[in-house]
């Protein structure tokens, strides 16, 4: 699970472009198949068999730096990825006609302040970026709700707005179904889950740490937060690709 890809080394939820490219190069050179979300869901349901190493690359929030710094590496190594977008931000960013591709991008803290000031175009993707990335055949886009609210304590009418409206907007803009959702901050409750399922979401991603296996719950797909290190990435991939090592490591990690 990624958020920002930019040069602000050491910043919150950020991987630097050089490290990100190194991680993607490793996946490519080590023979990993990067799955699309449809393929992942088919694998969970037992409808898809995998005879090679596989991984799923996801980004949360839809930051502009994903286009500037991550997209070139994804294209270079033919890596599939999914970005979960916050439609209010995308819509506001798209009100500006220019394709804002700055030579530098703000830190995470600065980005949040710009969002609060409604200057989304300076930090968020717009529909032009999204179309270009989608047209590459490598990057797909799904819902991270309408405005990135925690979904564990909202009334039902607001949940319907957050979960349903974002889905509708993405489907209208992309011209295809949006059956996948990612909870903001990983926060949700039974009511939110029920509304999401009734709205038509078929698989949902959370922030819980773990790997996906056949038979995993498609409504609570776990992920791994990626650190800003190629060595860390390689070591963790060796562990997580092995079912026995993975279970032992996750058991030990949970205990301590």
What residue ranges belong to the model's regions?
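Short, glycine/acidic-enriched loop or turn micro-motifs at the edges of active sites
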Residues: 63-64, 147
């Amino acid at each position: 699970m990624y958020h920002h890809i930019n040069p602000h080394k050491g910043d919150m939820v950020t991987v630097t472009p050089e490290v990100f490219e190194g991680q993607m190069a490793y996946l490519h050179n080590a023979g990993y198949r990067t799955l699309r979300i449809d393929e992942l869901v088919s694998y969970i349901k037992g409808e898809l068999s995998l005879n090679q190493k596989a991984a799923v690359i996801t980004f949360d929030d839809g930051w502009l730096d994903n286009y500037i710094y991550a997209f070139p590496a994804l294209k270079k190594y033919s890596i599939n990825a999914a970005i979960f977008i916050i439609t209010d931000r995308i819509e506001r960013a798209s009100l500006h006609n220019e394709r804002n591709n700055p030579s530098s991008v703000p830190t995470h803290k600065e980005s949040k302040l710009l969002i609060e000031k409604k200057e989304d175009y300076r930090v968020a993707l717009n529909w032009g970026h999204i179309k270009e990335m989608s047209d590459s055949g490598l990057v797909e886009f799904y819902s991270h709700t309408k405005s990135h609210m925690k979904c564990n304590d909202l009334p039902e009418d607001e949940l319907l707005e957050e979960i349903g409206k974002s889905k509708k907007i993405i489907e209208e803009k992309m011209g295809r179904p949006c059956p996948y959702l990612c909870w903001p901050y990983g926060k949700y409750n039974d009511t939110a889950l029920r509304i999401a399922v009734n709205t038509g979401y078929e698989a949902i991603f959370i922030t819980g740490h773990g790997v996906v296996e056949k038979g995993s719950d498609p409504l609570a797909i776990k992920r791994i937060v990626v650190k800003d290190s190629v060595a860390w990435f390689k070591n963790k991939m060796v562990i997580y690709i092995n079912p026995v090592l993975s279970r032992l490591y996750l058991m030990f990690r949970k205990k301590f």
